[in-house]
């Protein structure tokens, strides 16, 4: 029973990741957002909240990144509405956008390793 719940959460997370990426790229027409990439989604066990981890390929400044995430957070109601129309869930989770630092940390580690060689 427990593994079925985990598998269901993983499937829902993957589906939310795929659909939110499509919605952002095709329906959110705000040039201030830039080029976001959704690197992962964490859905709570009760399906009430979803943390959407996002990176930006065209932004390096933390202020620009925070501003873009703020814009996405303000559009989260619209994104959630479109998500509800495209998914077969009783309740669609509240979306919380967070910046994913793992890509930058990975680049730093690769640079450090290359300097050691």
Curated annotation (Swiss-Prot):
It is found in: Cytoplasm. Pfam families: RBFA (PF02033). GO terms for cellular component: cytosol. The keyword Cytoplasm applies. Its main location: cytoplasm. GO terms for molecular function: ribosomal small subunit binding. The keyword Cytoplasm applies. GO terms for biological process: maturation of SSU-rRNA. Keywords: Cytoplasm, Ribosome biogenesis. NCBIfam families: rbfA. Belongs to the RbfA family. One of several proteins that assist in the late maturation steps of the functional core of the 30S ribosomal subunit. Associates with free 30S ribosomal subunits (but not with 30S subunits that are part of 70S ribosomes or polysomes). Required for efficient processing of 16S rRNA. May interact with the 5'-terminal helix region of 16S rRNA. Monomer. Binds 30S ribosomal subunits, but not 50S ribosomal subunits or 70S ribosomes. This is Ribosome-binding factor A. It comes from Blochmanniella floridana. The lineage of its organism: Bacteria, Pseudomonadati, Pseudomonadota, Gammaproteobacteria, Enterobacterales. The gene is rbfA.
């Amino acid at each position: 029973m427990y593994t079925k719940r985990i598998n269901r959460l993983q499937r829902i997370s993957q589906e939310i990741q795929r659909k939110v990426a499509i919605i952002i790229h095709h329906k959110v027409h705000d040039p201030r957002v830039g080029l976001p990439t959704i690197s992962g989604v964490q859905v709570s066990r009760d399906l009430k909240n979803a943390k959407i981890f996002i990176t930006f390929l065209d932004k390096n400044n933390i202020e620009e990144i925070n501003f873009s995430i703020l814009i996405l957070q303000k559009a989260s109601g619209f994104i959630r509405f479109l998500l509800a129309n495209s998914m077969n869930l009783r309740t669609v989770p509240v979306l919380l956008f967070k910046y994913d630092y793992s890509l930058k940390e990975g680049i730093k580690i690769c640079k450090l390793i290359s300097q050691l060689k």
